Amino acid sequence: MLHGDITSSNDTIGVAVVNYKMPRLHTKAEVLDNARKIADMIVGMKTGLPGMDLVIFPEYSTHGIMYDSKEMYETASTVPGDETEIFAEACRKAKVWGVFSLTGERHEEHPKKAPYNTLILMNDKGEIVQKYRKIMPWVPIEGWYPGNCTYVSEGPKGLKISLIICDDGNYPEIWRDCAMKGAELIVRCQGYMYPAKDQQVIMAKAMAWANNVYVAVANASGFDGVYSYFGHSAIIGFDGRTLGECGEEDYGVQYAQLSKSLIRDARKNGQSQNHLFKLVHRGYTGLINSGDGDRGVAACPYDFYAKWVADPEGTREMVESFTRSTVGTEECPIEGIPNKKVAHR
C-alpha cells in the first residue's frame, strides 16, 4: 500500500478517486455532454498519473439527481448505451479501467417500473466487466428499483473488485458478502450529502478493517440546489488506515497504489486480525486446548441471519415489533410514503 507517487508496478494497481461536482441536468443531451466531460477528465488524469490503472467516479456523476420524476424516466439509460460508449472510448484512449454511475438504468419493464441505480466496471478495452444495481436505495428519498446481488470481477492486473453504492455501505452485511466472495477491493461510489460526513468517513475505514479489504470511495461535491455534498473521496488500506483523502473541493483527486501481494499475504498469514478466516474458525485455540479438533467452529452463531434466510416475512414482523409497521412516519410525513394517520384528539 503506497501513497504519494504517480506510478504503479506489476504488483500494484494505481487507483484514483474523484470528488466530482454534482451536476444538475434535465435532458438526455445534457447528460451526454456531461459524460463527455467525464471522458475528457479521464484522459487528462492519465497524463498526470501515468500509473493510473483504475479511475472511479461518484454515484450520480453522469446524470446528476433528477428531482423531476418525468426527467428521471426520460433520461434513464440502457446498458450498454450512449453513455457507456462515451466512457468506453475514453477508457480505450487512456488505457485505463473505470467505474461509472448510471442513474438510472432502465428497468426491464420500463417505463412501468422505476429505473435501477447502476454502477459499471469497464476495462481498458471499453468492455463492461461488472454491472451492479444498488441493493439498498436511500429510502424514503430515492425511488430506484432495488437490485438483489453483489458481484466480484477480476479487475486491472488481476485485482478482485466488487462495486457497491452509497447507502449500501451503511449495512455491514454487504461488505462481508463481497469480501467473503473474494473481493480484494470494494468500490463504494456515493452521492452523499451533509450532515452524515463523519459517519461515512468512519464507516469506510471500519469496513476496510473488519473485512481485511481495500476500500475506494468516490463521493460527489458541491451544491445542486437541494443538497450539499461533502466530497472526501478516499482510498483506504485493508488495515483500515487512510492512504489518501480529498477534502470538499470540486474535482479533487486522490491516488494510491494497492498491492496485490500484500493483501494476499495478509489474508494467508495474518492471525489475530484475520477477520475473514477467524469468522469460520471460531475459538480454535480453545477447541485445541479442549481436544475438540484444530479448526475451530464453522457454524454461524447468529440467530438473526438464520431466521432472515428461513423466514423473511417473519423476520420483518419481528423487526417491526420494535421499530414501526409502516414505511412512513406520521410525525414527519413525506409525500407518497404511507404512514399511520394521527388519531383525532
Curated annotation (Swiss-Prot):
What is catalysed by this protein? a monocarboxylic acid amide + H2O = a monocarboxylate + NH4(+)
Domain (CN hydrolase) ranges: 13-260
Which keywords belong to this entry? Hydrolase
Does the record's keyword annotation contain DNA repair?
no
GO MF annotation terms: amidase activity
The EC designation for this entry is 3.5.1.4
Q: Name the InterPro entries on file.
A: Aliph_Amidase/BUP, Aliphatic_amidase, C-N_Hydrolase, C-N_Hydrolase_sf
Superkingdom: Bacteria
- Where do the TM regions start and end? none
Q: What does this protein do?
A: Catalyzes the hydrolysis of short-chain aliphatic amides to their corresponding organic acids with release of ammonia.
Specify whether Hydrolase is a keyword of the entry.
yes
Q: Where is the active site?
A: 59 (proton acceptor), 134 (proton donor), 166 (nucleophile)
The taxonomy runs: Bacteria, Pseudomonadati, Pseudomonadota, Alphaproteobacteria, Hyphomicrobiales
HAMAP family referenced in this protein's UniProt entry, alphabetically: Aliphatic_amidase
Protein's name in the database:
Aliphatic amidase
SUPFAM superfamilies noted in UniProt = Carbon-nitrogen hydrolase
Return the Pfam families for the record.
CN_hydrolase
Annotated disulfide bonds:
none
Q: Which family does it belong to?
A: Belongs to the carbon-nitrogen hydrolase superfamily. Aliphatic amidase family.
EC primary class = hydrolase
